Amino acid sequence: MSPYTQVALSASMVKAILNGHKTQIRVPCATDHKDTLNNCFKSLPSHQGNILWVTEDFKVIFDYKCNDYLVIYRAGGPAKRINAINTDNPGSLFKHAHNSSTKWINSNHMPYAACRLWLEITDIRIEQLQDITEDDARAEGMHWTYQPAVFSIPQYDSEKGSYLASYQSFWNKKYGNWDLNPKVRVYHFRILRVSSELEPLLQKVNELKTIPFTTN
């Protein structure tokens, strides 16, 4: 078990974080909201300095030659190698290795040993949803381009041509009616640490402004 708070993120959002484009996340204040806990946080962090461990869609392959598990991520990037003997919970990885040869496993089922990304909460505030600014929407990882609206990051609503319009479209799809303007918790975060396999890629962020991820 991890002492940290689990947060499940889509492949697109993981890539946005690793590329330095996503540094905020908003969730409805109501703890019984159907998507807040089931599809994002397992429990809501409440203090600055709280640490989140990110779960994402993944596969596990067993390397019989090296007696290692290889964790492959839907967001792309290098696989994480985990020694079958030294891992704390080899049973969970073995189960996933047996069941995930062809299909991606949902992020909610990722064991802690497979995690490659940890975040630290740097600020928390409560505000109305529609208090979000254009800069905030950009910090949520939104992008837009001039093409028909598509319900997937990097662009959700490109016809209006703004990060805020993209975020509004994203909210409508994930949480429901934007016009209800609910209170939300706003979390600012930074990357605290990553797996050793990811460290070389993060070093390229300042040089390239983006990480050359490919999605399988």
Model-derived features: where do they sit?
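Secondary-structure transition motif
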Residues: 1-216
